[in-house]
Amino acid sequence: MQIGWSKRFSAIGVLALIVAATASAEKNHGPGVTDTEIKIGQTIPYSGPNSMYGTIGRAQAAYFEMINAKGGVNGRKIRLISLDDAFSPPKTVEHTRRLVEADNVLLIFSSLGTPTNSAIYKYLNAKRVPQLFAISGAAKFDDPKQYP
């Protein structure tokens, strides 16, 4: 089943990125990483016309809870800060800025939608904040030079 495979692939990729980021962090952790925690941010539509996709955010939160129950990643708990953007690009921008500037997340994880991802990619690139597993059907996000 393709959905199950892609979820496993996504989970492995997330863990690999987080392990790589935390393994090299030592005492100079950088944004979102401490000796005990890794903060990652997400905006996803829990309300509005595409609220059915909120299930993705709830499933991902449950996955990170399972990882944390097993000791986390390199002894650090993963803290997913997931905010409702109602599939509204202005709300996505507002929440993404909060996640980066106030919550100091390591990365933005699995943001959903072409219009919402289009609204935040330049900001994230300028702030040098990784955007991991942006969910979009747009081919434009397949160009790593323009969308690193």
Segments and roles (model prediction):
Residues 44-47, 63-64, 68-71, 100-103, ...:
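Sec/Tat-exported extracytoplasmic proteins
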Residues 35, 104-148:
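Extracytoplasmic ligand/sensor domains, especially the bilobed periplasmic-binding protein
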Residues 1-38:
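Short, low-complexity disordered leader/linker segments with a strong preference
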Residues 86-106:
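Short, well-structured alpha-helical segments in soluble
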Residues 71-87:
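Short helix-loop-beta-strand segments that form the rim/entrance of peptidase-like active sites
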Residues 28-36, 41-61, 83-89, 112-113:
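Extracytoplasmic "Venus flytrap"
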Residues 55-69, 91, 131:
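Short, solvent-exposed amphipathic alpha-helices that sit
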